[in-house]
From Swiss-Prot:
Main location: plastid
One Pfam family in the UniProt entry: Ycf4
Classification of source organism: Eukaryota, Viridiplantae, Streptophyta, Embryophyta, Tracheophyta
Protein name: Photosystem I assembly protein Ycf4
Protein topology in the membrane: Multi-pass membrane protein
Family of the protein in this entry: Belongs to the Ycf4 family.
One GO term of the biological process aspect: photosynthesis
InterPro entries reported in the protein's UniProt record: PSI_Ycf4_assembly
Membrane-spanning ranges: 22-42, 64-84
A single Gene Ontology CC term: chloroplast thylakoid membrane
Cell compartment(s), UniProt: Plastid, Chloroplast thylakoid membrane
Keywords: Chloroplast, Membrane, Photosynthesis, Plastid, Thylakoid, Transmembrane, Transmembrane helix
């Protein structure tokens, strides 16, 4: 969703609250709970899960390994659920021609750097750069080159843009900022 006028352009960035992240977090949580229950049932000698009789799985070594995988999966799942809860990576890009300032805001992990805020003068922006990496999983990322500060990504690296979409986005950004486009 974008808000745009002649002087101000605000582009909202979607964070980690994507459908794929929800699906992976649920699958990982359920799978790791299954592994942990099988490991615990092999330790107790009872059938906590009716699909696997505890007599078929010995606690040493299969039950220990299943418990380890279950605990590791719970840690990874809790990490995914935390990023979804905190909506890591979400924010906005605000381009203001009237004041001549570009503001980039993103949410990070809790702590000192929870709010990532970058403010740049439009005069310091050298160009809009498209970086294209081909292969089996092609990657197209849009960067804003800033004099003396390097490059700042304007798109997520995991977004799969078609060549037409990335070119259009680069052209819109370059036209609004009145800077050239570079392709690498």
């Amino acid at each position: 969703m974008n808000r745009r006028s002649e002087r101000i352009w605000i582009e909202f960035i979607m964070g980690s609250r994507k459908t794929s992240n929800f699906c992976w977090a649920c699958i990982l949580l359920l799978g790791s709970l299954g592994f942990l229950l099988v490991g615990i049932s092999s330790y107790l000698g009872r059938n906590l899960i009716s699909l696997f009789p505890s007599q078929q799985i010995n606690f040493f070594p299969q039950g220990i390994v299943m418990s380890f995988y279950g605990i590791a999966g719970l840690f990874i799942s809790s990490y995914l659920w935390s990023t979804i809860l905190w909506n890591i990576g979400s924010g906005y890009d605000r381009f203001d021609r009237k004041e001549g300032i570009v503001c980039i805001f993103r949410w990070g992990f809790p702590g000192i750097n929870r709010r990532i805020f970058l403010r740049v003068f439009m005069g310091d922006i050298q160009s809009i750069r498209i970086e294209v990496k081909g292969g089996v999983y092609p990657r197209r990322v849009l960067y804003m080159d800033i004099r003396g500060q390097g490059s700042v990504p304007l798109t997520r690296t995991d977004e799969n843009f078609t060549p037409r979409e990335i070119e259009q986005k680069a052209a819109e950004s370059a036209y609004f900022l009145r800077v050239p486009i570079e392709v690498f």
